[in-house]
């Protein structure tokens, strides 16, 4: 049967409106599709859970998440991050073969590493950048999602109040929807 993938943004990078990732993931899985999520806009503001612990449905999990830590506080020069369920990595040949992906080689034969985390990371890794990405996530965790969201919501409320008073500004999107402090007008 054909592979079905649903790939959505956890939040709009235009309006800041949040997606109900658990409900959408559940719907996708009930229809035999994989659930892929882009957290580029939402990642720095929300809790990122592959398997949300507070959800009743076992099919509300995410199969893959894409992150952009360079958008986080302290994140410039960090690499993009892919978090995916191990069973999705079934190809025994790496996408980009290179140094560090081969377990064995001789003139007649070769074998790639069995562990996809190592097999798919050919070449010289961006060590400093990866460490920086880890520190960015530690900073987010130390400050706390609730603190970040509360501060951002206060700033958003002030901005929206001022912009609504200006008749020549039209704010895009549903202002009553759960949203991040991202606004287009």
Q: Language-model segments: what does each one mean?
A:
Residues 1-185:
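Pyridoxal 5′-phosphate
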């Amino acid at each position: 049967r054909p592979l079905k993938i649903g790939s959505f943004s956890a939040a709009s990078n235009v309006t800041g409106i949040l997606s109900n990732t658990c409900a959408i993931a559940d719907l996708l899985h009930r229809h035999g599709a994989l659930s892929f999520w882009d957290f580029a806009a939402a990642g720095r503001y929300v809790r990122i859970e592959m398997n949300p612990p507070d959800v009743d449905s076992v099919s509300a999990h995410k199969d893959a998440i894409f992150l952009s830590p360079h958008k986080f506080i302290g994140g410039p020069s960090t690499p993009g991050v892919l978090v995916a369920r191990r069973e999705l990595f079934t190809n025994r040949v790496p996408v980009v073969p290179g140094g560090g992906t081969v377990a064995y080689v001789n003139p007649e034969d070769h074998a790639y590493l069995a562990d996809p985390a190592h097999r798919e990371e050919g070449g010289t890794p961006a060590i400093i950048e990866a460490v920086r990405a880890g520190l960015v996530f530690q900073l987010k965790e130390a400050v706390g999602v609730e603190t970040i969201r509360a501060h951002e919501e206060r700033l958003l409320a002030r901005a929206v109040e001022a912009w609504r008073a200006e008749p020549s500004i039209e704010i895009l999107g549903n202002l009553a929807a759960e949203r991040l402090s991202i606004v287009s007008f």
